């Protein structure tokens, strides 16, 4: 079976947006106009084809990125739906990693929201070119030009409108295409499937000319030949303008901007045209960086059918009918179902049972998958998110994804004995699907703790336990993941010697303990010279310290951001052993920590609250009571925006308090930002409670 769509006609795109900007509706309409779905699903009634997990249907928010294939004008579009809620940024990061381009959807009323900034930063981090779609132009308060301004101000980007709206709110009927200089008006009777191309209405001609001039100038800046032509007063052809927009979009010096109303079926076809005209094919993005596992040297993987198979597993889902699905982005070569792949991350071979092409809620079996495709593999047992699958003959490890540590933990207790066994298995499966979710056992109490990126994240996990795995569980109070660190440098010596008949134990070390930059982690430096400690015992000292740092001296929380230098010591020919040096390292670290001015750290959340002006004073007063530091106050569409850093421990139950303080008119979002020092009076309470 040969390739159906040439590589240069494939677009792997994601639709990324703030919650409620209308992302799922936009994905739905794309599937409708490209002929995949026959009845349009609305998020409001919980039937959208992209939102296929049950909890999403209830909450009306998109949680998992479903990958769907559709076709438009001889191009194949692989659509990856990304979640817009801040607790799920790990899902967004993960999909960004495998996209070639993105459509950023903004609400014409809400504009640039805090979550949009996070998603935008992630797209910058992974170098993903994007186009902007300003949605909901039919809503009261819709303002395309205000969103253009916010993208400049808040996202520091260079938005270049390639179409502008005709009318707004209930008079929004279509757009002016600034490339062709024509008006496109949608026909309400055909659910937006048909539209007419007309002359530009006279009252908008001036505005259209002004924006066309801006567009041409932005395009000319992309290419010297075009610049000369433009400065010489010559007209640029439509082809030249399109080429310039594409160049600027791919090198991210400009962001093409369009508008429409997905819900009212207007502007979706022009968006699809822009996807195939301006977003990159797999052949137009930079080669993917990887590491050769044998030599550890950097190698580049070129997107092409030639060469040995290489792909990245970016998502794992459990499907009730076929078991585990591993979503893979193929970068190079091709693979037939039933063949073996080599997991270079784990150094293991696995057999691919079936290859499935996903259409949001139905699936088709395919015989072979090619470069540039996104496909679900069935039958892989050991492959996890972020693993590389390739051909052993030309092995490569594609760059690893980095996953954040959880900031919140909740104890879960199974209700019955039967639930207990099922719960362990279920939590294991959920942790495989989602690397930002962790499961651990609390040593002192033997309770099972689950950790994640926020309350909603864990609520959904508990909900999935009940629904998908039929496990009934009670949950405890949320607990914050505190950390400890040190503030001063100390040198300490510890001699561990035991002589009590038979073979003794002897390990003797001198260490220097120093604080490091926040977020920089642990560092071990060996400065032993002249063999005062034999080199086979050095790793044991490091291991002893790493075990001891899991339980800090203040309250038993993990210790972070410090450097240990092992600079002297001694050993005994007969009595020294790895064990003795491990204990010596561990004891020396504990003694040094006590003397190094240890402090408690807590997760600080970046909180953005949006409230009507009359509640502003109450909200700020409340944030101050929660030990918040107010960073800025802005206006957005008649509402006040307060930005603050607030300790996570003070934010439990905030949504209820905010609702009652603002009569339901305030909204907020929060995400983990950094670890900050806990004030000493509060730290004292926490330590006493822990030890009590």
UniProtKB/Swiss-Prot annotation:
<dbReference type="Pfam" id="PF14492">
    <property type="entry name" value="EFG_III"/>
</dbReference>
<comment type="function">
    <text>Catalyzes the GTP-dependent ribosomal translocation step during translation elongation. During this step, the ribosome changes from the pre-translocational (PRE) to the post-translocational (POST) state as the newly formed A-site-bound peptidyl-tRNA and P-site-bound deacylated tRNA move to the P and E sites, respectively. Catalyzes the coordinated movement of the two tRNA molecules, the mRNA and conformational changes in the ribosome.</text>
</comment>
<dbReference type="GO" id="GO:0003924">
    <property type="term" value="F:GTPase activity"/>
</dbReference>
<keyword id="KW-0648">Protein biosynthesis</keyword>
<keyword id="KW-0251">Elongation factor</keyword>
<feature type="binding site">
    <location>
        <begin position="135"/>
        <end position="138"/>
    </location>
    <ligand>
        <name>GTP</name>
    </ligand>
</feature>
<dbReference type="GO" id="GO:0005525">
    <property type="term" value="F:GTP binding"/>
</dbReference>
<dbReference type="InterPro" id="IPR004540">
    <property type="entry name" value="Transl_elong_EFG/EF2"/>
</dbReference>
<protein>
    <recommendedName>
        <fullName>Elongation factor G</fullName>
    </recommendedName>
</protein>
<feature type="binding site">
    <location>
        <begin position="17"/>
        <end position="24"/>
    </location>
    <ligand>
        <name>GTP</name>
    </ligand>
</feature>
<dbReference type="Pfam" id="PF03764">
    <property type="entry name" value="EFG_IV"/>
</dbReference>
<keyword id="KW-0342">GTP-binding</keyword>
<feature type="domain" description="tr-type G">
    <location>
        <begin position="8"/>
        <end position="283"/>
    </location>
</feature>
<dbReference type="InterPro" id="IPR014721">
    <property type="entry name" value="Ribsml_uS5_D2-typ_fold_subgr"/>
</dbReference>
<dbReference type="InterPro" id="IPR027417">
    <property type="entry name" value="P-loop_NTPase"/>
</dbReference>
<dbReference type="Pfam" id="PF00679">
    <property type="entry name" value="EFG_C"/>
</dbReference>
<dbReference type="InterPro" id="IPR035647">
    <property type="entry name" value="EFG_III/V"/>
</dbReference>
<keyword id="KW-0547">Nucleotide-binding</keyword>
<dbReference type="InterPro" id="IPR005225">
    <property type="entry name" value="Small_GTP-bd"/>
</dbReference>
<dbReference type="GO" id="GO:0003746">
    <property type="term" value="F:translation elongation factor activity"/>
</dbReference>
<dbReference type="InterPro" id="IPR031157">
    <property type="entry name" value="G_TR_CS"/>
</dbReference>
<dbReference type="InterPro" id="IPR009022">
    <property type="entry name" value="EFG_III"/>
</dbReference>
<dbReference type="InterPro" id="IPR020568">
    <property type="entry name" value="Ribosomal_Su5_D2-typ_SF"/>
</dbReference>
<dbReference type="InterPro" id="IPR009000">
    <property type="entry name" value="Transl_B-barrel_sf"/>
</dbReference>
<dbReference type="InterPro" id="IPR000795">
    <property type="entry name" value="T_Tr_GTP-bd_dom"/>
</dbReference>
<dbReference type="Pfam" id="PF22042">
    <property type="entry name" value="EF-G_D2"/>
</dbReference>
<dbReference type="InterPro" id="IPR005517">
    <property type="entry name" value="Transl_elong_EFG/EF2_IV"/>
</dbReference>
<dbReference type="InterPro" id="IPR053905">
    <property type="entry name" value="EF-G-like_DII"/>
</dbReference>
<dbReference type="GO" id="GO:0032790">
    <property type="term" value="P:ribosome disassembly"/>
</dbReference>
<feature type="binding site">
    <location>
        <begin position="81"/>
        <end position="85"/>
    </location>
    <ligand>
        <name>GTP</name>
    </ligand>
</feature>
<keyword id="KW-0963">Cytoplasm</keyword>
<dbReference type="InterPro" id="IPR000640">
    <property type="entry name" value="EFG_V-like"/>
</dbReference>
<dbReference type="Pfam" id="PF00009">
    <property type="entry name" value="GTP_EFTU"/>
</dbReference>
<dbReference type="InterPro" id="IPR035649">
    <property type="entry name" value="EFG_V"/>
</dbReference>
<dbReference type="InterPro" id="IPR047872">
    <property type="entry name" value="EFG_IV"/>
</dbReference>
<dbReference type="InterPro" id="IPR041095">
    <property type="entry name" value="EFG_II"/>
</dbReference>
<dbReference type="GO" id="GO:0005737">
    <property type="term" value="C:cytoplasm"/>
</dbReference>
<comment type="similarity">
    <text>Belongs to the TRAFAC class translation factor GTPase superfamily. Classic translation factor GTPase family. EF-G/EF-2 subfamily.</text>
</comment>
């Amino acid at each position: 079976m040969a390739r159906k769509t040439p590589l240069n006609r494939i677009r792997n795109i994601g639709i990324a947006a703030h919650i409620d900007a209308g992302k799922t509706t936009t994905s739905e309409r794309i599937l409708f106009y490209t002929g995949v779905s026959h009845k349009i699903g609305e998020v409001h009634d919980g039937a959208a084809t992209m939102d296929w997990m049950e909890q999403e249907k209830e909450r009306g928010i998109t949680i998992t990125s479903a990958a769907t294939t559709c076709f438009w004008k001889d191009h194949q579009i692989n659509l990856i739906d990304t979640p817009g809620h801040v607790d799920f940024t790990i899902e967004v990061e993960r999909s960004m990693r495998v996209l070639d381009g993105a459509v950023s959807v903004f609400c014409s009323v809400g504009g640039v929201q805090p979550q949009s900034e996070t998603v935008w930063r992630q797209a910058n981090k992974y170098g993903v070119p994007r186009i902007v779609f300003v949605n909901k132009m039919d809503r009261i308060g819709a303002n395309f030009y205000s969103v253009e301004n916010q993208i400049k101000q808040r996202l520091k980007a260079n938005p270049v409108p390639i179409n502008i709206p005709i009318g707004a709110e209930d008079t929004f009927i279509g757009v002016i295409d600034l490339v062709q200089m024509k008006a496109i008006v949608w026909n309400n009777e055909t659910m937006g499937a048909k539209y007419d191309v007309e002359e530009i209405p006279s009252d908008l001609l001036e505005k259209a000319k002004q924006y066309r001039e801006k567009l041409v100038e932005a395009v000319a800046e992309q290419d010297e030949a075009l610049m000369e032509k433009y400065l010489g007063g010559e007209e640029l052809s439509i082809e030249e303008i399109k080429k310039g927009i594409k160049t600027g979009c791919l090198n991210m010096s400009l962001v093409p901007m369009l508008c429409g109303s997905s819900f009212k079926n207007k502007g979706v076809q022009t968006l699809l045209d822009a996807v195939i005209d301006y977003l990159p094919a797999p052949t137009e993005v930079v080669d993917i960086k990887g590491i050769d596992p044998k030599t550890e040297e950097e190698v580049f993987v070129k997107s092409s059918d030639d060469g040995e198979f290489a792909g990245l597993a970016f998502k794992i889902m459990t499907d009730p009918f076929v078991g585990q699905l591993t979503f893979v982005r193929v970068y190079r070569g091709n693979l037939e179902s039933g063949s073996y792949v080599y997991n270079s991350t784990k150094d293991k071979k696995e057999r691919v049972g079936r290859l499935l092409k996903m259409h949001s809620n139905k699936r088709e079996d395919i015989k072979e998958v090619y470069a540039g495709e996104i496909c679900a593999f069935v039958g892989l047992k050991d492959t996890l998110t972020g693993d590389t699958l390739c051909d052993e003959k030309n092995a490569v490890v594609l760059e690893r994804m980095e996953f954040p540590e959880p900031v919140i933990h909740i104890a879960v207790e199974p209700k019955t004995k039967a639930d207990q066994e099922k719960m362990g298995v279920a939590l294991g499966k959920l942790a495989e699907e989602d690397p930002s979710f962790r499961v651990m056992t609390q040593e002192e109490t033997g309770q099972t703790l689950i950790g994640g990126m926020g309350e909603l994240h864990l609520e959904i996990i508990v909900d999935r336990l009940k629904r998908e795995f039929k496990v009934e569980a009670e949950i405890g109070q949320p607990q914050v993941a505190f950390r400890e660190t040190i503030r001063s440098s100390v040198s300490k010596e510890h001699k561990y010697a035991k002589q009590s008949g038979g073979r003794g134990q002897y390990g003797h070390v001198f260490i220097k303990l120093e604080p490091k930059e926040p977020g920089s982690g642990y560092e071990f430096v060996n400065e032993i010279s002249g063999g005062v400690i034999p080199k086979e015992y050095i790793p044991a000292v490091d291991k002893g310290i790493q075990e001891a740092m899991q339980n800090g001296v203040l309250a038993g929380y993990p210790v972070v951001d410090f450097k240990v230098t092992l600079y002297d010591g001694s050993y005994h020919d007969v009595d020294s052993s790895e064990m003795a040096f491990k204990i010596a390292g561990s004891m020396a670290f504990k003694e040094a920590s006590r003397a190094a001015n240890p402090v408690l750290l807590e997760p600080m959340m970046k909180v953005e609250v949006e409230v009507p002006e009359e509640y502003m004073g109450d909200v700020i007063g409340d944030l101050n009571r929660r030990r918040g530091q107010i960073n800025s106050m802005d206006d957005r569409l008649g509402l006040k925006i307060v930005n603050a850093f607030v300790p996570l421990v003070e934010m439990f139950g905030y949504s209820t308090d905010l609702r009652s303080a603002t009569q339901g008119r305030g909204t907020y979002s929060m995400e983990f930002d950094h670890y900050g020092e806990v004030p000493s009076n509060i730290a004292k309470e926490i330590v006493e409670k822990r030890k009590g």
